Amino acid sequence: MKTISFNFNQFHQNEEQLKLQRDARISSNSVLELTKVVNGVPTWNSTGRALYAKPVQVWDSTTGNVASFETRFSFSIRQPFPRPHPADGLVFFIAPPNTQTGEGGGYFGIYNPLSPYPFVAVEFDTFRNTWDPQIPHIGIDVNSVISTKTVPFTLDNGGIANVVIKYDASTKILHVVLVFPSLGTIYTIADIVDLKQVLPESVNVGFSAATGDPSGKQRNATETHDILSWSFSASLPGTNEF
């Protein structure tokens, strides 16, 4: 059995186990800020990603076995400007190693229409693009930001959200639970995703987020995207330790 696990109860500056890309940074109060904040105010047209520094093997071409995994994290989205439209949201994603940050806005930094790469993602979308259903919503994304399945949720503005994402390799079901403790609300979504058909054997796992309107016409189309804690574990049958 090949296993990997890690746990960030909080984040430390100069954290060697994380790769920070574009505007992502770790604040002085140990929060992973995916998009830019200046003097406490989120900025527009910002994109950032944070990846676990080591690759994770999600399937084995020799045995055909696929890994099951579970990840838990807490996040907070603060929307100081309710008008016109806060944007855009954050995602947990799995993609091939060494991918470049994608387009911002509704592409969340994980998709580039001109040079796409395979990915699986769970989005927490706060802005309605032309391809989106009602907002905010949770979406399961496979190689596209047009989600295969969605469910709406009510955001606790500035509050803590707890997320559990589980993948069962035997059933190929990706299951997501979102909880806002202060509101007492729970949202769930699940879909079948065949990781072996979508992704290479080794991948990166992490987060990406973007604020809105690259044109700059609506500079209030923004919000914070903060990750407060993160754990991940995966097990791949029939192989040795990572």
Curated annotation (Swiss-Prot):
Glycans are attached at residues 45, 220. CDD domains: lectin_legume_LecRK_Arcelin_ConA. GO terms for molecular function: carbohydrate binding. It comes from the Eukaryota. Signal peptide: none annotated. Keywords: Glycoprotein, Lectin. Pfam families: Lectin_legB. Lectin. Belongs to the leguminous lectin family. This is Basic agglutinin. It comes from Psophocarpus tetragonolobus (Winged bean).
